[in-house]
Regions:
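Primarily recognizes the serine-hydrolase "nucleophile elbow" in alpha/beta-hydrolase
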Residues: 90-144
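Homeobox/homeodomain signature
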Residues: 2-4, 12, 38, 107, ...
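An N-terminal hydrophobic leader/cap segment in hydrolases
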Residues: 1-15, 20-27, 110-112, 117
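Serine-hydrolase catalytic machinery in alpha/beta-hydrolase-like enzymes
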Residues: 15, 20-105
Length: 144
């Protein structure tokens, strides 16, 4: 399936914190805040093209956020294999590092937003990463 881009979006590649090459969709904003969007379970068809992720991405863009939606390891053009939710924390850390490097000193607020499996990975990352100012989980799993 071709990747749909919103106006101003570009396709990017960046490394996970453990060295895998991941694909993403970046839309820059003038404001000093940025969000990483994490998709639902890869083994059940989740990707950065999931409608809930694309809707959240649009809402954050309308609120003035730079957005980075990406495919976890093993999804689409991202390298690697599914890591049961634990290895994917390295993917989110890599996305945050990419935003830091790309945007420089501009962002003062980094956020992570996830849907289902992505909310689980986002929560684990937010609990361990001081760069994250807030976390948004949509339909988080309750028994993981």
């Amino acid at each position: 399936m071709p990747i749909r881009l919103s106006r101003g979006s570009i396709l990017v590649r960046f490394p996970s914190s453990d060295g895998l090459s991941l694909e993403g969709r970046l839309t820059k904003a003038a404001a000093d805040r940025a969000v990483v969007l994490c998709h639902p379970h890869p083994l059940y068809g989740g990707s950065m093209l999931t409608p809930v992720i694309m809707t959240a991405e649009q809402a954050f863009q309308e609120a003035g956020y730079t957005t980075l939606a990406f495919n976890f390891r093993g999804v689409g053009g991202s390298e690697g294999a599914h890591g049961e939710g634990k290895a994917e924390v390295a993917d989110v850390a890599g996305a945050l590092g990419y935003l830091e490097a790309t945007l420089g000193d501009r962002p003062t607020l980094f956020a992570v937003a996830g849907y289902s499996f992505g909310s689980y990975v986002g929560a684990m990352t937010a609990a361990a990463d001081e760069r994250i100012g807030f976390y948004l989980g949509v339909a988080p799993p309750l028994n993981h």
